[in-house]
Regions:
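PLP-dependent amino-acid enzyme catalytic core
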Residues: 1-272
């Protein structure tokens, strides 16, 4: 029987979970099982495909997006890639605004999907990109900013999909969730769902040591792309996490490489 999808967007979600047993063994972890959810299996390669599709679906349902609309989004990278993919599949023009410090590879991926890029001063971080996106939205008719940092559809899609997927795949045997905080949508949605199933689940938020906004209230420069926006996002539910840990740039780089070498899985800096 044929199984042909009408769009790549039907492939978003339902990603597999693997046991990082070799990494755990080499790290000396003997009292825990480390599991990794492979969000790279999404069509555009990251967990951000989920929120990209969710925010566009939500906007279309509410009439905020229609034929001829222009999508504008400030992003540090993967959300832009996800949105560029969704925009291409739905036929929208899209402009991505991002700090100039983000990797060239991410820029090339967005352009490959047909996105237009506007780069902002790196020192101004995501705040600078957000301000520029707002400026462009005022200048361009029929424009729409999904606003991943403030859009409730962001954590909601994780509450409806990512969280339940983890719970079901593990038969409810979840003790600890560890997630980096960029917008905070993944941690808030997944963590909130898991705690609704079992209040004893511990949720750990990860942020860059160079920009410990959640743990110390101070923002700064760092090299862990994808997390550490430099402010507390509106969609982050600070009641969900039980602990905050900070990670140094070099530790994130090194761990990401170790996972590739030891598990055969290529992950980004924020996963490291």
């Amino acid at each position: 029987m044929s199984d042909i999808k009408s769009s790549t967007l039907e492939l978003v979600g339902k990603t597999p979970i693997v046991n990082a047993s070799r990494y755990a063994a080499k790290a000396g972890v003997t009292d825990a099982t480390i599991l990794v959810k492979l969000e790279a299996f999404n069509p555009a390669g990251s967990v951000k495909d989920r929120i990209a599709k969710a925010m566009i679906d939500d906007a279309e349902a509410k009439g905020a997006l229609k034929a001829g609309s222009v999508i504008i989004e400030p992003t540090s990278g993967n959300t832009g890639i996800g949105l560029a993919s969704v925009a291409a599949a739905r036929g929208y023009r899209i402009i991505i605004v991002m700090p100039e410090t983000m990797s060239v590879e991410r820029r090339q991926l967005m352009k490959a999907y047909g996105a237009e890029l506007v780069l902002t001063e790196g020192a101004k971080g995501m705040k600078g990109a957000i301000a520029k996106a707002d400026e462009l939205a005022k200048e361009i008719p029929n424009s729409f900013i999904p606003g991943q940092f403030v859009n409730p559809a962001n954590p909601e899609v994780h509450k409806k999909t990512t969280g339940p997927e983890i719970w079901e795949d593990l038969d409810g045997k979840v003790d600890i969730l560890v997630a980096g905080v960029g917008t905070g949508g993944t941690l808030s949605g997944v963590g909130g769902y898991l705690k609704s199933q079992n209040p004893n689940v511990k949720v750990v938020a990860v942020e860059p040591a160079g920009s410990p906004v959640l743990s110390k209230g101070t923002a700064g420069a760092h090299k862990i792309q994808g997390i550490g926006a430099g402010f507390v996002p509106d969609v982050l539910d600070t009641r969900v996490y039980d602990e905050i840990i900070t990670v140094e740039n070099q530790d994130a780089f090194a761990t990401g490489r170790k996972i590739g070498h030891q598990e055969g899985v290529l992950v980004g800096i924020s996963s490291g």
